[in-house]
Swiss-Prot record:
It comes from the Bacteria. Its EC number is 2.1.1.33. Residues 14-26 have a biased composition (Low complexity). Substrate binds at K182, D214, T298, S299, F300, E301. The active site is at D178. Keywords: Methyltransferase, S-adenosyl-L-methionine, Transferase, tRNA processing. The keyword Methyltransferase applies. Catalyzes the formation of N(7)-methylguanine at position 46 (m7G46) in tRNA. This is tRNA (guanine-N(7)-)-methyltransferase. It comes from Arthrobacter sp. (strain FB24).
Length: 319
């Protein structure tokens, strides 16, 4: 996820042991403590902050190491907001000039830390609103002695809009975002036309936007959104269509059983795939990328496989 021009593909990860001895002036970092839901700046947010309290080793890791690995951003209104005057200086932060990869919704840090370990010449910024996830990422950074990862607790659209200089990012990753199944919640989905425009602004020309989801409805949504963007080209346009399409396989297998637009437990309802759209039967559009080898298979992805769901990868190049 060989096309040209294209940034090089990274090739594709837990217990806190010794921390790397890299002295640096401490920075005050305060994790948010106020739950966020509803809107920000008049727009629905794509997340619900469930659990911001830290305990045990997470609390210890955050207290001891967040001043080194967490980017402290001045807030605007909400505790995950970014003041519009703040600009992230990656070269100053990492002490070098290197390709910058931004993972949005980095969770517990498995993917970003594994990628950083495999690609020491690349720098990584993990964007997350789940404070325990950030603390877990800090634990991994220290136990693996990584120096090329930073974490930031912030709302992703603001990070892309103002925090990151235009044209400064080599790749943006969004792996397994919240699908917001119910129709009335689709407006909360992270990937919308406005979001695609923000990604385009942050990326360098030729930079990559990688997406992965285990829900066909969201995959079709992303494909439709990106098809409407003049800023990107699908690197796998028309590929894996017809019987080879994972979407065709989902439609014909009925693996995603839904009732009222939300997933239900196995055996609780008859098979229905009408949520995927009117083109049920054979996907003649395709456009699905092969699995991105740079993405480690996390426990989250493993659960999707165990449930029988297929993974949809999409990869777009910034024009």
């Amino acid at each position: 996820m060989s096309e040209s021009p294209e940034t090089p593909e990274p090739s594709p990860a837990q217990s806190p042991e010794a921390a790397p001895e890299q002295p640096q002036a401490a920075r005050p970092v305060t994790p948010g403590s106020q739950a966020s839901f509803g809107t920000y700046g008049g727009r629905p947010v794509s997340f619900v902050r469930r659990g911001t309290r830290l305990q045990g080793r997470r609390q210890q890791a955050w207290e001891e190491h967040s001043d080194r690995w967490a980017v402290d951003v001045p807030r605007h209104i909400a505790n995950t907001s970014v003041h519009p005057d703040y600009v992230f200086d990656a070269e100053a932060e990492f002490g070098r000039s290197a390709p910058l990869i931004v993972e949005i919704g980095s969770g517990l840090g498995d993917a970003v830390c594994h990628a950083a370990e495999e690609n020491p010449d690349w720098d990584f910024l993990a964007v997350e609103v789940y404070t325990p996830g950030l603390a877990n990422t800090v634990i991994k950074i220290n136990s693996r002695k990584l120096s090329n990862v930073r974490v930031v607790e912030a709302n992703a659209p603001e990070v892309l809009a103002t925090m990151l200089p235009a044209g400064s990012v080599s790749e943006v990753w969004v792996f397994f975002p919240d699908p917001w199944h119910k129709s009335r919640h689709h407006k909360r989905r992270l990937i919308q036309p406005e979001f695609a425009a923000l990604v385009a602004a942050a990326l360098k020309p030729g930079g990559l936007f990688r997406v992965a989801t285990d829900w066909s409805n969201y995959a079709v949504h992303v494909r439709d959104v990106m098809a409407g963007s003049a800023d990107f080209v699908n690197l796998h346009d028309g590929e894996r269509r017809g019987p080879e399409s994972p979407l065709t396989q989902v439609w014909q297998s009925g693996v995603e059983s839904l009732v009222g637009g939300a997933p239900v437990k196995e055996g609780r309802a008859p098979v229905s795939t009408e949520h995927t759209g009117p083109n049920e039967g054979v996907d003649e559009t395709g456009g699905w990328a092969p699995r991105f080898e740079g993405r480690i298979r996390t426990s989250f992805e493993n659960k999707a496989h165990e449930a029988g769901r297929l993974i949809f990868d999409l990869c777009y190049r910034r024009l």
